[in-house]
Amino acid sequence: MAIEKPVIVACACPLAGHVGPVLSLVRGLLNRGYEVTFVTGNAFKEKVIEAGCTFVPLQGRADYHEYNLPEIAPGLLTIPPGLEQTGYSMNEIFVKAIPEQYDALQTALKQVEAENKSAVVIGETMFLGVHPISLGAPGLKPQGVITLGTIPCMLKAEKAPGVPSLEPMIDTLVRQQVFQPGTDSEKEIMKTLGATKEPEFLLENIYSSPDRFLQLCPPSLEFHLTSPPPGFSFAGSAPHVKSAGLATPPHLPSWWPDVLSAKRLIVVTQGTAAINYEDLLIPALQAFADEEDTLVVGILGVKGASLPDSVKVPANARIVDYFPYDELLPHASVFIYNGGYGGLQHSLSHGVPVIIGGGMLVDKPAVASRAVWAGVGYDLQTLQATSELVSTAVKEVLATPSYHEKAMAVKKELEKYKSLDILESAISELAS
């Protein structure tokens, strides 16, 4: 007699870089016969329903999205990017959303209970609304909680020679200063929710709270952790477009033959959140405007977006509003982007080295430091690059074989990790 699969209650903060990896794995679970309820913001309702999930919306403070964050965290407009802003964002955006997140999670669990079914919760690093479960807050309990690591790991790590940007995050005093306000807020919130246990230091609680923590990267892209909790393990990257069974674009752009025939293809994007094309994309176009043997494809990151009329697009450049990375990257020599964690995984899954221009914005320094440490990336160390800086970086990466060699090594490592299988194994263990 077959064991009935638990209902999966997936949860993600309503930001593209957080929803994307969870939804990618959820699609795989749906294909394997799981029923999925997805808790996230209304901005992602359509995507969640299209995937085949039951949608449960976040409410109030938790229902934000990329473009209205200053409304709930006005300090983002005045505090410069860096550690202070990181600590502020952690508290104002993520910790203070816990009550509404937990409320939505309970709504989802009640729906599952009403059908006399069991549930396993799958969250992601910054969906802190799963913490009340392990801390004894009143409410329904799932059979287990799995958290997916959708951002660079924040556990204590050994020093990494040659990566000075990591030093502040390793220093215990700095970690305490930056994240103590968030820790204090979480303690107060847990009291309000009726939790019977007090949370640990915030950065530790994120990893010790779930039954299983699956970091979505291979070991080679993470610093050597000093003391990860028992449930922590690596799971490789989330399935990308093709491996997740999604359809390729219904029609390729008219310039697609140019991609296939290009001697050298450079792909550049600024992601979907921090979009000022003058920071990185336009300088990249300008950097190679006179190189006939190079094709530059710029992805604007938002459907319907276009460059200002004042921007002259070089003859060797092609601009597209929105396009799957996995269609272009197999043909690319280098990927220039703003340092999102998912973008790094996408690029390296195709063996393509990266150039990162994210400056000190949110988790971008953490991603860049790992790319540099692993030898697969070049950090521009600024949010506002010049064409000269971009040109210098690309020339160094293309002229240094080790970048490509190490990127290919990570690609092979990623191929050994079957993230969907690893996730399903964890689900089975908790549901048995």
Swiss-Prot record:
Catalytic activity line of the entry: (9Z)-17-hydroxyoctadec-9-enoate 17-O-beta-D-glucoside + UDP-alpha-D-glucose = (9Z)-17-hydroxyoctadec-9-enoate 17-O-sophoroside + UDP + H(+)
What CDD domains does the annotation carry?
A: GT1_Gtf-like
Q: Which UniProt keywords apply?
A: Glycosyltransferase, Transferase
What does the record give as EC number?
2.4.1.-
Q: What induces it?
A: Induced in early stationary phase (at protein level).
Q: Which domain of life is it from?
A: Eukaryota
Q: Which GO terms describe its molecular function?
A: sterol 3-beta-glucosyltransferase activity
Which Gene Ontology BP terms does the record give?
Answer: carbohydrate metabolic process; lipid glycosylation
Uppermost EC category: transferase
Pfam families per the UniProt record, alphabetical = EryCIII-like_C (PF06722), Glyco_transf_28 (PF03033)
Checking InterPro entries in the record gives: EryCIII-like_C (IPR010610), GlycoTrans_28_N (IPR004276), UDP_glucos_trans (IPR002213)
What family does this chain come from, according to its entry? Belongs to the UDP-glycosyltransferase family.
Described by its record, this protein's role is as follows: Catalyzes the second glycosylation step of sophorolipid biosynthesis, the further glucosylation of the previoulsy formed glucolipid to give rise to an acidic sophorolipid.
**Listed PANTHER family:** GLYCOSYLTRANSFERASE, UDP-N-ACETYLGLUCOSAMINE--N-ACETYLMURAMYL-(PENTAPEPTIDE) PYROPHOSPHORYL-UNDECAPRENOL N-ACETYLGLUCOSAMINE TRANSFERASE 1
UniProt name for this protein: UDP-glucosyltransferase B1
User: Where does this protein come from, organism-wise?
Assistant: Starmerella bombicola (Yeast)
